[in-house]
Amino acid sequence: MIARRNPEPLRFLPDEARSLPPPKLTDPRLLYLGFLGYCSGLIDNLIRRRPIATAGLHRQLLYITAFFFAGYYLVKRENYLYAVRDREMFGYMKLHPEEFPEEEKKTYGEIFEKFHPVH
Protein backbone atom coordinates (compact mmCIF):
# COMPACT_ATOMS: atom_id res chain seq x y z
CA MET A 1 0.00 0.00 0.00
CA ILE A 2 1.05 3.54 -0.63
CA ALA A 3 1.57 5.52 2.55
CA ARG A 4 0.73 8.83 0.91
CA ARG A 5 -2.27 8.78 -1.42
CA ASN A 6 -1.55 12.05 -3.22
CA PRO A 7 2.05 11.91 -4.52
CA GLU A 8 1.90 15.49 -5.79
CA PRO A 9 2.61 17.88 -2.90
CA LEU A 10 0.12 20.63 -2.09
CA ARG A 11 -2.42 19.49 -4.67
CA PHE A 12 -5.98 19.31 -3.38
CA LEU A 13 -7.38 17.85 -6.61
CA PRO A 14 -4.96 16.47 -9.22
CA ASP A 15 -5.74 16.79 -12.94
CA GLU A 16 -6.68 13.10 -12.93
CA ALA A 17 -9.78 13.99 -10.87
CA ARG A 18 -11.27 15.88 -13.83
CA SER A 19 -12.22 12.60 -15.49
CA LEU A 20 -14.67 11.80 -12.68
CA PRO A 21 -18.29 12.97 -12.86
CA PRO A 22 -19.05 15.99 -10.68
CA PRO A 23 -21.02 15.51 -7.46
CA LYS A 24 -24.75 16.15 -7.66
CA LEU A 25 -25.79 19.56 -6.39
CA THR A 26 -28.56 17.89 -4.39
CA ASP A 27 -26.09 15.72 -2.47
CA PRO A 28 -27.24 15.68 1.18
CA ARG A 29 -23.71 16.45 2.38
CA LEU A 30 -23.66 19.65 0.31
CA LEU A 31 -27.09 20.70 1.53
CA TYR A 32 -26.01 19.99 5.11
CA LEU A 33 -22.91 22.17 4.72
CA GLY A 34 -25.04 24.95 3.21
CA PHE A 35 -27.31 24.71 6.24
CA LEU A 36 -24.25 24.89 8.51
CA GLY A 37 -23.26 28.07 6.67
CA TYR A 38 -26.70 29.54 7.35
CA CYS A 39 -26.43 28.58 11.04
CA SER A 40 -22.97 30.14 11.25
CA GLY A 41 -24.47 33.40 9.94
CA LEU A 42 -27.13 33.24 12.64
CA ILE A 43 -24.53 32.55 15.31
CA ASP A 44 -22.45 35.48 14.02
CA ASN A 45 -25.49 37.74 14.43
CA LEU A 46 -26.12 36.34 17.91
CA ILE A 47 -22.53 36.95 19.03
CA ARG A 48 -22.53 40.51 17.69
CA ARG A 49 -25.94 41.20 19.33
CA ARG A 50 -27.80 41.92 16.12
CA PRO A 51 -31.33 40.75 15.26
CA ILE A 52 -30.64 37.08 14.66
CA ALA A 53 -32.67 36.18 11.56
CA THR A 54 -33.09 39.55 9.85
CA ALA A 55 -29.75 41.36 10.14
CA GLY A 56 -27.13 40.80 7.46
CA LEU A 57 -29.05 38.61 5.02
CA HIS A 58 -26.29 39.23 2.48
CA ARG A 59 -23.78 37.85 5.01
CA GLN A 60 -25.92 34.77 5.60
CA LEU A 61 -26.10 34.19 1.84
CA LEU A 62 -22.32 34.57 1.63
CA TYR A 63 -21.85 31.97 4.39
CA ILE A 64 -24.25 29.56 2.67
CA THR A 65 -22.44 29.95 -0.65
CA ALA A 66 -18.98 29.62 0.88
CA PHE A 67 -19.84 26.50 2.88
CA PHE A 68 -21.62 24.92 -0.12
CA PHE A 69 -18.62 25.69 -2.36
CA ALA A 70 -16.14 24.25 0.15
CA GLY A 71 -18.33 21.17 0.61
CA TYR A 72 -18.54 20.67 -3.16
CA TYR A 73 -14.76 20.42 -3.43
CA LEU A 74 -14.48 18.27 -0.31
CA VAL A 75 -17.00 15.80 -1.78
CA LYS A 76 -15.16 15.91 -5.11
CA ARG A 77 -11.88 15.11 -3.35
CA GLU A 78 -13.52 12.30 -1.40
CA ASN A 79 -14.86 10.78 -4.63
CA TYR A 80 -11.39 11.03 -6.18
CA LEU A 81 -9.72 9.30 -3.23
CA TYR A 82 -12.31 6.50 -3.35
CA ALA A 83 -11.73 6.12 -7.11
CA VAL A 84 -7.95 5.85 -6.60
CA ARG A 85 -8.45 3.26 -3.86
CA ASP A 86 -10.86 1.26 -6.04
CA ARG A 87 -8.43 1.37 -8.98
CA GLU A 88 -5.61 0.04 -6.78
CA MET A 89 -7.85 -2.66 -5.33
CA PHE A 90 -9.15 -3.87 -8.71
CA GLY A 91 -5.60 -3.75 -10.12
CA TYR A 92 -4.45 -5.99 -7.29
CA MET A 93 -7.36 -8.35 -7.88
CA LYS A 94 -6.49 -8.52 -11.58
CA LEU A 95 -2.81 -9.30 -10.83
CA HIS A 96 -3.61 -11.95 -8.18
CA PRO A 97 -6.68 -13.90 -9.38
CA GLU A 98 -5.69 -16.98 -7.33
CA GLU A 99 -6.52 -15.08 -4.13
CA PHE A 100 -10.03 -14.24 -5.38
CA PRO A 101 -11.64 -17.44 -6.73
CA GLU A 102 -14.95 -17.26 -8.58
CA GLU A 103 -17.82 -18.42 -6.42
CA GLU A 104 -20.41 -20.68 -7.95
CA LYS A 105 -23.60 -18.86 -8.79
CA LYS A 106 -26.73 -19.86 -6.89
CA THR A 107 -30.32 -19.37 -7.91
CA TYR A 108 -32.88 -17.74 -5.65
CA GLY A 109 -34.53 -21.13 -5.21
CA GLU A 110 -31.36 -22.47 -3.59
CA ILE A 111 -30.96 -19.45 -1.31
CA PHE A 112 -34.50 -18.97 0.01
CA GLU A 113 -36.47 -21.50 2.01
CA LYS A 114 -39.72 -22.90 0.67
CA PHE A 115 -42.69 -20.67 1.37
CA HIS A 116 -45.62 -22.23 3.24
CA PRO A 117 -48.51 -19.80 3.79
CA VAL A 118 -50.34 -19.90 7.11
CA HIS A 119 -54.09 -20.62 6.82
Swiss-Prot record:
Membrane-spanning ranges: 56-75
Keyword Methyltransferase tagged: no
The keyword Magnesium is annotated on this UniProt entry: no
UniProt keyword list: Electron transport, Membrane, Mitochondrion, Mitochondrion inner membrane, Respiratory chain, Transmembrane, Transmembrane helix, Transport
Subcellular location, record wording: Mitochondrion inner membrane
Predominant location category: mitochondrion
Membrane topology of the entry: Single-pass membrane protein
Disulphide bridges, residue numbers: none
UniProt record, GO biological process: mitochondrial electron transport, NADH to ubiquinone
Subunit organization: Complex I is composed of 45 different subunits. Interacts with TMEM242.
Known function: Accessory subunit of the mitochondrial membrane respiratory chain NADH dehydrogenase (Complex I), that is believed not to be involved in catalysis but required for the complex assembly. Complex I functions in the transfer of electrons from NADH to the respiratory chain. The immediate electron acceptor for the enzyme is believed to be ubiquinone.
Entry protein name: NADH dehydrogenase [ubiquinone] 1 subunit C2
Source species: Pongo pygmaeus
